[in-house]
């Protein structure tokens, strides 16, 4: 897929995710694999519901901008580490929904476990509700290289992992194509909302 086509996919993803309330204001960042050595990412500080062709830039896999005058998101390394370690990944989405943020703060453990939900089958490789979807939660850290170093061992040990939360911050998920990553965002958001409602009903 060409740069122009990937840019359109990123722009359309931003409009969709902003419209759902999952990427408010200038939060969040999105990317697509441009080649084996380059990624296309949203420029830092841009409103995700109002992205245009100039609001994306190419970076190398170390997170360095390849376009003078354009600054990548501070969290670029969390995108490129997925492209580097998982050749099948073609798109990465990071969102800041209310449900993801609140649930990550309410959960004292370092992970969430979802089971017996039919919608688990929306995740790549899951074929039955009689399974577990484990979502790790990493503490937020302004030092992105240090945060990436904490995430990588989990990714290496859990090839089935479909996404993770950063506490008080948001969700990262990915897919072979942008449509796959968007599908998983929707599935995660459904599960997060169910979990919060279950906790409210059970008063825990």
UniProtKB/Swiss-Prot annotation:
GO terms for molecular function: methylthioribulose 1-phosphate dehydratase activity; zinc ion binding. One of its GO terms (cellular component) is cytoplasm. One of its GO terms (biological process) is L-methionine salvage from methylthioadenosine. Its EC number is 4.2.1.109. Keywords: Amino-acid biosynthesis, Lyase, Metal-binding, Methionine biosynthesis, Zinc. Pathway: Amino-acid biosynthesis; L-methionine biosynthesis via salvage pathway; L-methionine from S-methyl-5-thio-alpha-D-ribose 1-phosphate: step 2/6. Binds 1 zinc ion per subunit. Zn(2+) binds at residues 94, 96. Its cofactor is Zn(2+). It is an enzyme of class 4 (lyase). It catalyses: 5-(methylsulfanyl)-D-ribulose 1-phosphate = 5-methylsulfanyl-2,3-dioxopentyl phosphate + H2O. Gene3D superfamilies: Class II aldolase/adducin N-terminal domain. InterPro entries: Aldolase_II/adducin_N, Aldolase_II/adducin_N_sf, MethylthioRu-1-P_deHdtase_MtnB. HAMAP family: Salvage_MtnB. NCBIfam families: PRK09220.1, salvage_mtnB. Belongs to the aldolase class II family. MtnB subfamily. Catalyzes the dehydration of methylthioribulose-1-phosphate (MTRu-1-P) into 2,3-diketo-5-methylthiopentyl-1-phosphate (DK-MTP-1-P). This is Methylthioribulose-1-phosphate dehydratase. The lineage of its organism: Bacteria, Pseudomonadati, Pseudomonadota, Gammaproteobacteria, Pseudomonadales.
